[in-house]
């Protein structure tokens, strides 16, 4: 699911990236 944890974490740049 999450490729990058840094962008996947809540409050970060893109939480949507977690779904991609």
Swiss-Prot record:
It comes from the Eukaryota. GO terms for cellular component: extracellular region. It is found in: Secreted. This is U27-ctenitoxin-Pn1a. Expressed by the venom gland. It comes from Phoneutria nigriventer (Brazilian armed spider). Keywords: Disulfide bond, Secreted, Toxin. Has a vascular smooth muscle contracting activity. Causes short-lived contractions of both arterial and venous rabbit vessels. Residues 11-20 have a biased composition (Polar residues). One of its GO terms (molecular function) is toxin activity. Residues 1-20 are annotated as: Disordered. Signal peptide: none annotated. Contains 4 disulfide bonds.
């Amino acid at each position: 699911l999450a490729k990058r944890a840094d962008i996947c974490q809540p409050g970060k740049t893109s939480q949507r990236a977690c779904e991609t």
